[in-house]
């Protein structure tokens, strides 16, 4: 969409920008931490530390998907998450996976080899450092985005201080799908490496502002969206 201002015979127009409407989703926002947190400084509600149960929480969301799962993850070697992906595939869920090709990704040896995987490799833009899952993007009541700082590795989940953020919102899920499919190179089940874009090669094509459960949420993808400036 764009804004156009007209005064007499003169007019000016803004650049074309993507926008998202408010969805009919539940609108929950849940944040979890892999290590203990100091709740003495909480101002609204106490943060929740899942500890070694973080992988089970991620696995539960994966297996809750009914139709589609798009996963973009820097690295994976956690058995609970691997098994959850296998369960989703066995349940008929369409699963697509983007991985950083320079990592070990040892977990793939335990995942159903029918799952299509697109590896970001040298010559395909900068490294793929995402950690997100989009579930059931076309179902307003079940759509979710799971993201955060943690890789899907046992070390990141059980030892390192990390976080997991889960949002139940279809508009956000569709925005993440735009980002996923730009790296995937297609809208189908098979990736198109010739059309895939990573890093600075990506377009600025995702909405930035959302209203989720009555709370304003902003979305930025590095390096194209001016993420550092938005944080500052």
Question: Where would I find each of the regions flagged by the language model?
Answer:
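Short Gly/Pro-enriched turn/cap motifs at secondary-structure boundaries
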Residues: 120-125, 155
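Charged, low-complexity intrinsically disordered terminal segments
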Residues: 14-96, 101-115, 135-232
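Extracytoplasmic
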Residues: 127-129, 214
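Internal, well-ordered alpha/beta segment that forms a basic, Gly-enriched binding/recognition surface
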Residues: 132
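Beta-strand-rich modules
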Residues: 1-8
């Amino acid at each position: 969409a764009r804004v156009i201002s007209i005064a007499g015979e003169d007019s000016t127009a803004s650049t074309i920008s993507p926008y998202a409407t408010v969805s009919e989703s539940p609108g929950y926002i849940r944040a979890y931490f892999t290590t203990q947190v100091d709740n003495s400084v909480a101002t609204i509600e106490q943060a929740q530390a899942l500890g070694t149960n973080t992988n089970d929480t991620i696995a539960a969301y994966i297996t809750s998907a009914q139709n589609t799962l798009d996963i973009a993850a820097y690295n994976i070697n956690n058995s609970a998450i691997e098994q959850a992906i296998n369960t989703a595939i066995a349940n008929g869920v369409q699963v697509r996976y983007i991985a950083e090709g320079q990592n070990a990704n040892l977990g793939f040896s335990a995942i159903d080899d029918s799952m299509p995987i697109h590896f970001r490799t040298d010559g395909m833009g900068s490294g793929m450092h995402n950690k997100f899952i989009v579930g059931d993007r076309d179902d307003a009541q079940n759509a979710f985005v799971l993201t955060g700082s943690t890789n899907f590795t046992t070390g990141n989940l059980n030892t390192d201080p990390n976080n997991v953020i889960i949002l139940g919102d279809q508009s956000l899920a569709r925005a993440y799908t735009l980002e996923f499919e730009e790296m995937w190179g297609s809208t189908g089940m098979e990736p198109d490496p010739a059309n895939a874009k990573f890093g600075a090669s990506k377009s600025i094509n995702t909405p930035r502002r959302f209203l989720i459960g009555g709370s304003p949420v902003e979305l930025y993808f590095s390096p194209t969206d001016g993420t550092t400036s938005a944080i500052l």
